[in-house]
Each structure stands twice: as C-alpha cells, then as structure tokens.
Amino acid sequence: MLKRHQQLLFRLIRQSVLHQSSPTSSSASSTLLNSENGEKFVKTVVDRLAQCQAGNATAAPEQISYWESISKQSAKVSDGRSELSQLRTIINDPKETEEMRKLAEVDVESIEENLETELQELAVKIVPLNNLDVLSKCQIELSCGAGGQEAMLFTGELLDMYQKLAAVNSWKWDPLQVDNVPLGGVRSALIAVSGEKVYAKMRFEAGVHRVQRVPVNDSRMHTSTASISVLPEPEEVSVVVPSDSVKIEAMRASGPGGQNVNKRSTAVRMTHKETGIAVHCMDERFQHLNIQIAYKRLAAILMQKQVDAMLEKIVSKRKLQVGSKARAEKIRTYNFQHDRVTDHRIQMSITGVAEFLSAGETLQTMIERLQEQHLEDRLDHIIENCIVE
C-alpha cells in the first residue's frame, strides 16, 4: 500500500502528462478464473505443488512442470489484484487529495488492462496443448447440399475461399479429389492441407454452411447449403494404419472415358480389417498413387473416430462441437442481401460477404474468435471439474 502511494505521489510531483485508455472489458476466460470455482482450482494446484516441494507427495515431472507454470502465472494475477485493491483504497479515501485520486483512477485502468492480459495468459497455462492443437495436417471435405446448381456454385466459392486462406497462411494445398460441374461450381472435393497448426485453425469450419442470395437467372431469394468436414490427418500414416491392418483390392477406374478408363486396374478399394471401414480412390492414373491417397484417407477417418470416442467421454457445456457431431450442425449463414456473414455458434456477425469469401481479415478474425471460444469451453470444463492432473 505504501509503495503504491509513493509511486502516485512521485508522479504527481513530476506533473506527468497522463493519457486515459478505454476501459477494459473482461473476457469469458477472465470471468471463469475470477469465479469461486476458478479460484478453487488455482488454490488446489498451488497446494498440490507445495506438497510435492515439501516432500509430502510425489508427481510425474511433467505434472510438476504444469503446476509450476500455473502457480507462477497465478502469482502475477495475485499481484495485479493486490495493486487494484490498493488503488481503490486510495480512490475511496476522503483524506487523499483530488489529484492523488485522479492519478489512482488512471492507474486503475492501466492495471485492469494488465490484469486482463495476465488472466488470459493464465487460461492458456491451465489448458494444456494436446496433439490436435499442434497437428500440421488435415483433410477438408466439401459436399454440396440442398439447392441444386446454386449449392454447387456456393461449394465452389467455399473451396476457393479455403484455398486462398491456405495461401495467406503459407499452407500446402493438395487436392485429392475434385468433382467439378460443367455449368460451374463443385459437387464435392477432398483436399489435403498441411502447415503449422492447420487442424486447430480449420476444425471449426466443419458443419453446414448456408448461403442466401438471388441467383443471376432468378428474381427470388434462394437458400442453398454446403457441408464441410475437417478430419485430422496423423503425422505418420503408418502408425495409425499399418500395412497389415488393411485389405487392398484393385479395381478398374470408372468415368466418362479416356485411355485409362476400364483398361487397367488403377483404382483401389482399401478396407480396414478391424472396423470394416472402406475407402475408394481412382482419381490418379497410377495405382501406387491411389494407394497412397487411400492410406491417407483411411488414416484420417480412423483418427477422427478416435477423436469422437475421446469427446464422448467429456460431458460439458461446449458451444463448439468438434468431430463428427459438427458435420450436421448449421454453423454459418452468408446473407448477400444484407452483406452479412453470421456464425450461429458464437453469435458473431461480420459485414462484407465478398471480403470474407476472399479469405480477408474478417475470415481470420472469425477463426480467431472460434479458437478463443474453444479455449473458454475447455477452460470451463477443467475448472468446473477441478481437473488438476
């Protein structure tokens, strides 16, 4: 208290020129950490760490490291809260001069901003990174839904949007299957994408995307849909799908015509023996390339099943669905008439459909907000259940 008072007095003597900043709004993560359950969780972690340091308990080195990071960050949060308390005491003290109280009010805003930052950092420390958070490979599957030709055009626009997003983020974009429509648009597509933390950024694009607009050849508003699936692809396919775990059958490729169709058995069907899951691949001219693609596709499907099984064990109030459940959920509407894109999961609307579809800053902003919501969901689950290990 004395130290804070001396700091304010020194500033007053120097007659510093002070600039007020806008008030800081608390995030959902901060609210959780400031709650009774949040404080209980942090106290439990600090107590467990103290017991280990005193030799009264034991824990794995990685567990102790996790507790230490939370304990150190929570100490910074405690310091910030203490400073705020001291400043508010000065503000409410009638014996203080008006100048001193004004300086304290300005400092309150600055400390609140710093405290919000420290709370956000504490949230990141509490929610540990898992393999999916750092996965550098994923597969994006697009399928046109209701709406006929308009749905195919919209699916093509989404495909272009994600390709531009990949370019912006310097991701590798590898089309595995693309079913283009002669009149324009895409019926379906399967893309392998790789890059730093690509799955973490793309996973919440999974779901039903809806477009509302007036087609060029009509005067009425049309509503069309496209479905997006985002599957995690393992870093090492052979670990998830060993060669002896599958049955590979050669087939003749089918298609509209050409030298290679029905003449050579280049297409393959790969069946996972344990689960019976089968994938077909015939887009490449050479069989070994189709086999490689089939392995990747099967590995992604099996990894998705593992993710689904893991999520089934978690009972929480998550706003964002991850995995197979997300595919049937209507997640976003692109309204051309009102030039607005709305994500229904986080109740976020952004103006500028064209910029959004061109993978501009607005798309990046929405992806970041979805990641923040995911962090909040996981933080809520950990704190509510006091999961300290």
From Swiss-Prot:
Record gene name: mtrf-1L
Post-translational modifications: Methylation of glutamine in the GGQ triplet is conserved from bacteria to mammals.
GO cellular component: mitochondrion
UniProt keyword annotations, A-Z: Methylation, Mitochondrion, Protein biosynthesis, Transit peptide
Annotated compartments: Mitochondrion
Source species of the chain: Caenorhabditis elegans
Keyword Mitochondrion set for record: yes
Annotated InterPro entries: PCRF, Pep_chain_release_fac_I, Pep_chain_release_fac_I_sf, Prokaryotic/Mito_RF
Protein name: Probable peptide chain release factor 1, mitochondrial
